[in-house]
């Protein structure tokens, strides 16, 4: 079922809101405690106040660089960067920052973000490592796109290992820990998958069609206890070039559900600005492919990529993108989905791992429905990268298609696990690296070491 986080849309007391926005988290915590002690406090408000604590933790963890530290880090990578340039990058929202306790703190990876999204600065980087890395990845994608277009379909077979290790002096040896490791979900482009080996016997394995599929374990704690799994999978990508002239607008009941057009609070919401912006982008067309393409073009040409803090710390993910015109792969995918649904085009979430030889890691993308083609993919962040680098063919490709280097772990956003967690997840919206908790509390990030490693990957006809 959908994880109910609708209470995050409810208003907070004005003093607590001001303290949160200004980063005065100790004062905020004191007022939260005061409010929670009131027996007349509405239950919905209580949940929102408790969630705000997680937001504060995430922000403190993500924004730790003072202005001088951020500038020094930038100068190490770009030796000729001036302070005026640094301030301009701050003011045009390239460098992400927040006020915490009255001081400006920058996002820990803001310089990496600058070098990955602003090519003129990447060209000035000492060693140009990021630029070379991106050029290699782009060449790899372009070669595969040409091959897929030529052959019409490509299969990919992969093997990976994932694990969660726990080490903490706040846990008692022998107490039960609960683990959820992500498993591939049966959704296009996945053809098959197999759980080959686990470090411990799983208590429960979700069905293949579970929206966020997991292997669930219960293991007694000991120092550095590790729960691990080895997976194999096969995907098949078929090249499709959606033609608006062939679109019918039909929504077959077997292919499309109410969920594919629904709002899901707190983020997939047809807020007034979202509706106005979508109308402006889409215009008066009734063609679902044209609608989706106009939304894709808006996000990929007007928006830019930015590394994001934990989604728990963002009150309105889609509203954030619409106001700031930047965000990471998940923010862009969720914005695409919400805009599509807002104008009557069915759309849904997909996420998991990108598993190419040059790059292996977490990634999010979207799907939209257009008869007679059925469900099609849209990868706004990869499309935006292609647009920024003048790669029109690759930009067009990621509207309607994916490369086969995808391992989907989730087919829905904000879905509960089976069995559900007892405490707030580190990521209540998605599941790409797994979750862990004890029977009495959630586990903190400094108690956990999560990893995933690609063991092998082969493209095949």
What are these regions (language model features)?
Residues 288-295, 325-340:
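Active-site nucleophilic cysteine motif
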Residues 13, 20-23, 27, 207-211, ...:
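Acidic low-complexity segments
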Residues 400-461:
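Low-complexity, Gly/Ser/Thr/Pro-rich intrinsically disordered linker/tail segments
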Residues 6, 10-14, 18, 22, ...:
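Hydrophobic/aromatic-rich core segments of domains that either
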Residues 29, 34-239:
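Intrinsically disordered, low-complexity N-terminal segments that are enriched in acidic
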Residues 195-198, 243-253, 380-383:
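Short intrinsically disordered coil segments
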Residues 1-44:
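Mature N-terminal, pre-catalytic/accessory segment of carbohydrate-active enzymes
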Residues 179, 295, 366:
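Terminal peptide-recognition signature
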């Amino acid at each position: 079922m959908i994880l109910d986080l609708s209470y995050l849309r409810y208003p907070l007391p004005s003093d607590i809101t001001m303290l949160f926005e200004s980063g005065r988290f100790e004062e905020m915590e004191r007022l939260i405690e005061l409010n929670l002690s009131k027996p007349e406090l509405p239950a919905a408000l209580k949940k929102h106040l408790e969630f705000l604590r997680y937001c504060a933790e995430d922000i403190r963890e993500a924004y730790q660089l003072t202005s001088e530290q951020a500038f020094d880090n930038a100068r190490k990578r770009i030796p000729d960067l001036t302070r005026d340039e640094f301030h301009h990058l701050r003011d045009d929202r390239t460098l992400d920052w927040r006020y915490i306790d009255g001081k400006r703190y920058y996002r820990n990876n803001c310089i990496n973000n600058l070098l990955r999204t602003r090519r003129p600065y990447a060209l000035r980087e000492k060693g140009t490592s990021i630029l070379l890395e991106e050029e290699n990845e782009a060449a790899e994608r372009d070669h595969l796109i040409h091959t897929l277009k030529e052959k019409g379909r490509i299969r990919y077979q992969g093997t990976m290992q994932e694990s969660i290790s726990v080490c903490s002096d706040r846990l008692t040896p022998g107490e039960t820990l609960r683990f959820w490791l992500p498993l591939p979900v049966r959704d296009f482009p996945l053809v098959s998958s197999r759980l080959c080996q686990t470090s411990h016997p799983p208590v429960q394995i979700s069905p293949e069609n579970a929206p966020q599929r997991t292997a669930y374990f219960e293991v007694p704690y000991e120092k550095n206890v590790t729960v691990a799994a080895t997976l194999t999978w096969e995907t098949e990508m078929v090249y499709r070039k959606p033609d608006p002239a062939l679109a019918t607008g039909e929504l077959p009941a077997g292919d499309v559900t109410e969920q594919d057009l629904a709002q899901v609070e707190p983020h997939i919401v047809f807020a007034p600005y979202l509706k106005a912006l979508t109308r402006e982008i889409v215009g008066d067309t009734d063609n679902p492919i044209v609608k989706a393409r106009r939304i894709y073009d808006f996000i990929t040409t007007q928006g830019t990529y930015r590394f994001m803090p934990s989604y728990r710390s963002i009150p309105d993910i889609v509203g954030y993108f619409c106001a700031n015109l930047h965000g990471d792969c998940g923010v862009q995918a969720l914005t695409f989905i919400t805009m599509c649904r807002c104008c009557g085009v069915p759309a849904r979430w997909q996420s998991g791992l990108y598993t190419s030889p040059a790059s292996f890691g977490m990634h999010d993308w979207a799907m939209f429905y257009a008869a007679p083609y059925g469900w099609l993919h849209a990868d706004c962040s990869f499309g935006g990268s292609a647009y920024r680098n003048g790669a029109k063919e690759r930009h067009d490709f990621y509207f309607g298609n994916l490369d086969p280097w995808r391992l989907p772990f989730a087919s829905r956003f904000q879905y509960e696990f089976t069995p559900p967690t007892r405490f707030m997840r580190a990521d209540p919206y998605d599941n790409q690296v797994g979750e862990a908790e004890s029977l009495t509390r959630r586990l903190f990030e400094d108690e956990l070491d999560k990893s995933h490693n690609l063991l092998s990957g082969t493209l095949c006809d």
